[in-house]
Curated annotation (Swiss-Prot):
GO terms for molecular function: ATP binding; RNA binding; tyrosine-tRNA ligase activity. GO terms for biological process: tyrosyl-tRNA aminoacylation. A motif ('HIGH' region) lies at residues 38-47. HAMAP family: Tyr_tRNA_synth_type1. InterPro entries: aa-tRNA-synth_I_CS (IPR001412), aa-tRNA-synth_Ic (IPR002305), Rossmann-like_a/b/a_fold (IPR014729), S4_RNA-bd_sf (IPR036986), SYY-like_C (IPR054608), Tyr-tRNA-ligase (IPR002307), Tyr-tRNA-ligase_bac-type (IPR024088), Tyr-tRNA-ligase_bac_1 (IPR024107). Keywords: Aminoacyl-tRNA synthetase, ATP-binding, Cytoplasm, Ligase, Nucleotide-binding, Protein biosynthesis, RNA-binding. L-tyrosine binds at Y33, Y168, Q172. The gene is tyrS. This is Tyrosine--tRNA ligase. Signal peptide: none annotated.
Length: 427
């Protein structure tokens, strides 16, 4: 069993912590929880830092609980949001809860050990909780002044905040109180933007029971340039393979900058300090090998998806971005071709469009603009810059006749620059 707080400190995973928590953790095995609002049918990489808090908490011998916010998700957390969230239907919330629970099982141990993880849903204790009872049992213990002092509320006052969202901190505070009473939960964890909600729960427990509870938050992960972490050009990077393919997930981590990778490997892997220090030293000696990025991508792709998905994603990356030749493409079996390129964006043209195209500009235009290119001028510039190839053969003249052999008798593999690949399917 290792020291939970010391482990988080060297990993840079502590933003705020209440006094006394470290001593309490050394006294006994305690139970802690993190809440996840089911606002989408999948968690995304922005949630991973808090999921890793629960993982390290369990590895340190403590008991983790993940609470899916079936009740609080009907409102949406206003913490540091600029506008009020759109309400989801009950059916959407139930579907999202089910999906999220499956994903959490990839990280936490739900075996029968002493500190087995638990999954709970706060709709179970809120569904029969009437408004008058809520005012008596919760509202009377927390003053308006206390609630107004929260930074997350202050930021919304000028533009207006609804009573629904203003009351959110009371709901989350009651979650903590309920779990304290029924499960012996003494610790709530979350992202740095959750500090106000966490301390409301601590205050409610103190006022109703006179007992002490604790909170810990992890820093919100940002890139080295200060921008939000967890998004690509296409939007959020999801943990669900139908929303973000294993290949795209793998590529996201592989494309991290060296500066980001040095921080992220501490947050998102379970490697020891010695192992990480050794990898960083090797990476500094040969940064072009992207040792850190490959390690992060491997560990997370296997954990979130599977080892098979990782192997396929790696093989696809090597074929697309490595030193593969046109001959390597022709040698692929149809089965391997489908597996390797299943994540590549695909556009469709007819055989007639292919044969009647007089030059490469016509061929690309026949696919329709908006996916590969936005205009013929953009295609022409790419060719002039030497950044366009088809089936691993560089296109040098925008007016050359597209006398191209189809892969698997129906595909053309288009590469634009180093990172963008597309399939043209001919039927």
């Amino acid at each position: 069993m290792y020291d939970f707080i010391a482990n988080l400190r060297w990993r840079g995973m502590i933003h705020d912590i209440t006094p006394g928590l470290e001593a309490q953790l050394q006294k006994e095995m305690i139970t802690g929880y993190i809440g996840f609002d089911p606002t989408a049918p999948s968690l995304h990489v922005g949630n991973l830092a808090t999921i890793m808090l629960l993982k390290h908490f369990q590895l340190a011998g403590h008991k983790p609980i993940a609470v899916v916010g079936g009740a609080t998700g009907m409102i949406g957390d206003p913490s540091f949001k600029s506008t009020e969230r759109k309400f989801l239907s009950e059916e959407e919330l139930l579907h999202n809860q089910s999906c999220i629970m499956k994903q959490l099982k990839c990280f936490l141990d739900f075996s029968s050990s002493a500190n087995t993880a638990e999954l709970l849903n706060n709709i179970d204790w809120f569904k029969d909780f009437g408004f008058l009872r809520f005012l008596r049992e919760v509202g009377k213990h927390i003053s308006i002044n206390y609630m107004m002092a929260k930074e997350s509320v202050k930021r919304r006052l000028e533009d207006g905040i609804s009573f629904t969202e203003f009351s959110y901190q009371l709901l989350q505070g009651y979650d903590f109180y309920y779990l304290y009473n029924t499960k012996g939960v003494k610790l709530q964890m979350g992202g740095a933007d959750q500090w106000g909600n966490l301390t409301t729960g601590i205050e409610l427990i103190r006022r109703k029971t006179g007992e002490e509870a604790f909170a810990l938050t992890a820093p919100l992960i940002t890139k080295a340039d200060g921008t939000k972490f967890g998004k690509s050009e296409q939007g959020n990077i999801w943990l669900d393979s139908t929303m973000t393919s294993p290949y795209e997930f793998y590529q996201f981590w592989l494309n991290c900058t060296d500066e980001d990778a040095c921080r992220l490997i501490k947050v998102f892997t379970l490697l020891s300090k010695e192992e990480i220090d050794n990898l960083i030293e090797l990476h500094v000696q040969a940064p072009h090998q992207r040792i850190l990025q490959k390690q992060i991508a491997k560990e997370l792709t296997i954990r979130v998806h599977s080892e098979t998905d990782y192997m396929q994603a790696r093989k696809t990356s090597e074929l697309l971005f490595g030193h593969a030749t046109a001959e390597d493409l022709w040698e692929l079996s149809e089965k391997d071709f489908k597996v390797i390129f299943k994540s590549i964006p695909e556009v469709h043209i007819t055989l007639t469009q292919l044969t009647e195209a007089e030059h490469m500009l016509d061929l690309v235009a026949s696919t329709g603009f908006g996916i590969m290119f936005n205009s013929k001028g953009e295609v022409r510039r790419a060719i002039q810059e030497g950044s366009l190839s088809v089936n691993k053969e560089k296109i040098t003249d925008p007016l050359q006749k597209p006398n191209l052999k189809l892969l698997q008798d129906k595909y053309l593999l288009v590469q634009r620059g180093k990172k963008h690949h597309y399939l043209i399917k001919v039927s």
